[in-house]
Amino acid sequence: MRMTIKRTVVIPDLQCPYEDAQLVKNLAAFIKSFRPDAVLTIGDEIDLPQISRWHENQPGWYEQTLAADRDRTVDVLWELTQHVREAHMVRSNHCDRLYNVIMKKIPAFMSLPELKLEKFLKLDELGIKYWKEPMPIAKGWVAIHGDLGALNPNPGMSALNQSKRMGVSVIMGHTHRAGRSAVSEAYNGSVRRVLHGVEVGHAMNVKAAKYVSSPNWQQAFAIVTEHNKNVQVDLIYVEKDGTFLVYGKRYGRAR
């Protein structure tokens, strides 16, 4: 039987323009060197605070920065995906803000193709496939953003709860926490099934996220390796200086 291996790098929440610029550079350099088969961004690639319901009728609602934030997001996505054959993105609550505000305020604008998220973020030009439903990232695993379910403050448990609800192992973002957990289903001394939940952290500049003061967040990303029927998910934690270790080799330039 022919042995095949597929490696996918999973990028956590970026929320441009609040992304950690040095970490983005380090991740892009790692992807260029590591040469995975695919890159997946797990959602919230852009923050879109200007059209958030929290900013409605507040000064932020009138800021003329949307175009600059969009262009920055497109540049970041290009940096992270230019060296792979496949690039993917899953739907998320922050990216949904564009659709939500149009539907609430000016629903007729939904007929304009340039306001669809795929066009707005130039995903077609970048070669990024957009998944509105859970993405089957590997055998027995799906990737979701993670905003459509109850959250647990313990890293990995929100993802595990999603996996138990969906009946498959789950890798997700949204919580900005990095961790994993698992549950086994056994009967009469035999393990029938093991479900995993993995949360991939974040890649934000926490100082720029002024809406939190002492968040329980961790910077990280993940590597999903599929080898025929076997799947290995490695959670890679980022050091305080923005560097990280992958399979015994250190990557990135320190801040």
List each model region and its residues.
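Acidic carboxylate-rich catalytic motifs and surrounding loops in phosphoryl-/glycosyl-chemistry enzymes
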Residues: 88-94, 129-133, 234-239
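Core catalytic region of metal-dependent phosphoesterases/phosphodiesterases
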Residues: 11-124
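Hydrophobic/aromatic beta-strand patches that form the interior of the parallel beta-sheet core
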Residues: 9, 40, 88-90, 169-171, ...
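Short His-Asn-centered micro-motif
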Residues: 11-12, 42, 90-92, 133, ...
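Conserved beta-sheet core of the metallophosphoesterase superfamily
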Residues: 140-236
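Short acidic low-complexity segments
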Residues: 120-140
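A short C-terminal boundary segment appended to hydrolase-like catalytic domains
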Residues: 225-255
